[in-house]
Amino acid sequence: ADASPNIEPADTFLERHGLAGLSATDVIETLEAMPVAERPANLLASVRPDEVVLTDDENNQASMPLPDDQFYVSIAPYASQTHDCFFHSLTTCRGELANESVQITITAADGTELAAGTYTTNDNGFVGLWLPRDIAGTITITAGERTVSAPIATGVDDPTCITTLQLT
């Protein structure tokens, strides 16, 4: 069985991995935007609804709380190939459509537009969005002539990684 991780302060962990001084939101945004080839192979960063959990290849672990009012969701629309995922891994998750332009609209159940615009997927094939916590609504993604719509939610039991949106 795996040994229990060595839990350490986030500052100590971040400094050792070249992320010194970054907030939890900065860690997420930095790793998400990093070209795949430059991502640290010895670092796992798992985005949970309320924290980001960092683990390295020496079994050190740190966690950083996320803002109380925000929920990070990373979305990888796809045409033909995807993977199952629930908590987004900033260093290992890969989506099919890397560096592609997509239109995304997210509308809350009450009709409020939470996000709308043209986004470019990161090198890992994902678009990461900060949304209000505890909402439910609909996400629509369009890429070229293909579109997909699906429910989306940002509660404590909801996924931070959405890989089920097939463009048709």
Say what each PLM segment does.
Residues 1-12:
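Short, low-complexity, disordered segments immediately C-terminal to signal peptides
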Residues 145-150:
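Short acidic/polar inter-strand loop motif in beta-rich domains
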Residues 112-124:
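Short, acidic Ser/Thr/Gly-rich low-complexity loop/linker segments typical of extracellular
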Residues 82-103:
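Short, ordered, surface-exposed loop/turn motifs in non-cytosolic proteins
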Residues 64-66, 71-78, 156-168:
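Extracellular beta-sheet/turn segments enriched in Thr/Pro/Gly and aliphatic residues
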Residues 135-144:
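A short, solvent-exposed beta-strand micro-motif common in secreted/extracellular proteins
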Residues 10-69:
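N-terminal secretory signal peptides
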Residues 121-129, 139:
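Glycine-centered loop-to-beta-strand initiation motif
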